[in-house]
């Protein structure tokens, strides 16, 4: 089976090909999956959307594609973490993926179920002051 052939409902973690294309920054296949009508809001067993995976993989081009199609910028996974939270964990709140998400209105003060926000996480990791960055 190839990435674009008949798609099973998901792997053992509930991930579908669009999750993987998003994680690995495979814009070509992500675009094909979008064009074929794959559900852009599909979630895995942890409640993570393809945008969560694009954020984790720092896949700016795929994230931009998903955002251009109107996906929810602050979608929460089962722990209350948003794509910006995952991007912050990977980058300490720095880099193009964080800039893209903030530029599309991601909330740096959105608290997860543990009461931690991306801004607080960035500070704890020794990263940038996201509150200042989101205001600029």
How would you describe each model-predicted region?
Residues 20-26, 53-59, 86-94, 121-127:
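Ankyrin repeat A-helix N-terminal signature
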Residues 1-35, 136:
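Intrinsically disordered, low-complexity regulatory segments in ankyrin-centric signaling systems
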Residues 26-34, 59-67, 92-102, 127-135:
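Ankyrin repeat structural motif
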Residues 102, 107-136:
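Leucine-rich solenoid repeat scaffolds
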